[in-house]
Amino acid sequence: GVVYEVVAAEWLRGDGGATDRGGGMIYVPFLNFADGDLDAVHAMLSHPDAIPGLSDGGAHVGMICDGSFPTTLMTHWARDRVGARLPLERLVKAQAHDTARAVGLHDRGRLAPGLRADINLIDTSALRLHAPQVVHDLPAGGRRLMQRASGYVATLVAGRVTYRDGVATGALPGRLVRS
């Protein structure tokens, strides 16, 4: 039979159980899973020119939750995957430095004097995604998927702490980026 990745079973099981009040979901991926594993995705992520990123700009917030992608890269691909993994430092560089360069944000993506100092301090051993939940917090009660993560100790934007242990500090040093 086809052997599928452990993460698929974990997603189907979820962590809300009977107490999620109908807010859970079942997601059945079919792309890049034809052989019952994610080896094709590993090959793509391993390519030296690959810049991993995923977003649809919020167009389908009631069906998918792409905001979990960076955490998935670090937990599944660097730490937990059974089989070939990817080095954490390569994934962080790809998500920070390589992505910033690709979109012309040359003052971000690495730590150096004079740069913005946008930093995530992560406890990689505690890093985990929680099961997606349906929330109704958009205008007119519109729904979207929310997926929380644990293990982010602090987030700094322009050197100021904006989140500590998942709680917003109230600091808003960010600014709108225009192309």
Predicted ranges, named:
Residues 43-50, 55, 121-175:
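C-terminal cap of metal-dependent C-N hydrolases
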Residues 1-7, 87-96, 111:
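Short, well-structured alpha-helical segments that form the helix of a local strand-helix-strand
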Residues 10-15, 81, 99, 103, ...:
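A generic secondary-structure signal for well-formed alpha-helical elements
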Residues 94-98, 117-118, 156-158:
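Mid-to-C-terminal alpha-helical segments outside catalytic/metal-binding sites
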Residues 69-73, 170-173, 178:
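Cofactor-binding beta-sheet edge motifs in enzyme active sites
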Residues 27-36, 41, 87-90, 100-134:
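Acidic, glycine-enriched loop/beta-strand segments at the rims
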Residues 1-85:
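Active-site neighborhoods of metal-dependent hydrolases
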Residues 67, 71-85, 92-94, 124-136, ...:
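Feature captures the catalytic cores and cofactor-binding loops of soluble hydro-lyases/lyases
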